[in-house]
């Protein structure tokens, strides 16, 4: 039957990509339908019970800055929070949280059910309705036909998924859920370029059978307790739990090697390529044969369960090998496995077949997001989902696509990498992928993106007001640092050496003192207080606010979360100003031709002196801008120069020399 209501946007899949896509489209005013095979699994954490990490935490902050759900849901469900790389520079510091699976799923579902203009429907999707070269809806497994103006497909590992445990395998989307075989077959009929990838998960352990006295405890950060969302607070967190650390041994590795002859990975049963940076334990033992031990983290799955996730031993080995290997580790000698580990193979579609908006080049109105694009990880999926949901909504609203730049967001890096380079293995985000990472920090994601989110309708009034309070506070305190001067005579040498490293030779602005190595905001605030007190001796204080300027005073005025965020922003922006300025210059130089639009009808075979390889690649991929063309694998700077000359000379019909000038086109 044809459902009587037509929707603006249909989202297929209720995982991390699908939920963010549906919420984004609905926030932007589109009538949105989320189709899922099971409403009870909306927002389910199918693998590890954690959110964030290096590069990944940056994506979560960006999702949050755009009004997404992942960060707030993590704050409500997180049972341990840590800052990774805390001793390193601000660009690579990242938040990571262990999450209670039940609480996280409930937090996501609550947002879905209370989001205006968003409808849910429980049915697997078997087919897409396509007219000509455009999608106009979806068909469920019982034949209900839903019409829409755009469809966002976020099928995860369900497309022709197959689970492997040893040499046994069966069709599944994940453990306990059926695969989407009909939909996968339909997509292949549409001649979309596809391949196979694989990922895996470890066995789960009953915590009552773990000897914790033999393990190393790993607590979360306590002072201060991190939060993920710019709207979050540590008071939102439930009860906190520690993680625990054990190690594999040479005996463990012997057991694992003994199962290689029954491993689907080593016997050629699995054809899909797995994630390089999250290898299975059998892959680690094989590739790093010289290592006698690997660290394993035992992570609690939640407050209402005894289940533990042993991070570091993802495996598809036979169950008897899994059990023996686990029981060879310290503290796990009596371990009982609740769920076996497994690998899953699934279809993905080459992301080079997508436009910059994540709309497929072959089928108008059809957008892909998440693991279907060859990525791995909850955070990468959620970021793509939000991006695809935004652009599906903007297409419905007859607006240009939103395309964040590489220097603007990790989301921009993610999208650009996928559509220009494609994937040969599951793609995950790292800070090293971003050439402008000093600008793309966790602490300033809101300053980079919330304005754009508000303009697109993603950011509500409450978040917008909170953002403006922070932005105004940063501006005010930055000005105070620049305009407050300290005379050397007003700061005793002993205090100067204690606070800023050495006695002052002359008058300094506080901002210059803050730039010194080892000097933080608390130190310069105390400098200001001492100087103010000495200046005011014997007369009435000329500026009571200056006398009280301190972290404690700002916390009292704004609350701890905002005060600490503002201070962090001040310290980073001040100390790294020179580096940031240099990076801004690089951005400006790169932007000279980055956004130059390439004509859709450009024939690369007519560009003089291009190599056959470069012509083939550009003709096949058809990048949308010169910047994208420059990042295609095998395309050299010399090739880009030849292409630019071709465009400037107006050799492409309808593309005059004026069109190739810098700034003449915007992405």
Curated annotation (Swiss-Prot):
Gene Ontology annotations of biological process type: tRNA methylation; tRNA wobble uridine modification
Compartments where found: Cytoplasm
Protein's name according to its UniProt entry: tRNA uridine 5-carboxymethylaminomethyl modification enzyme MnmG
Gene Ontology CC entries for this record: cytosol
Complexes and interactors: Homodimer. Heterotetramer of two MnmE and two MnmG subunits.
Gene Ontology molecular function terms on file: flavin adenine dinucleotide binding
Binding site for NAD(+): 274-288
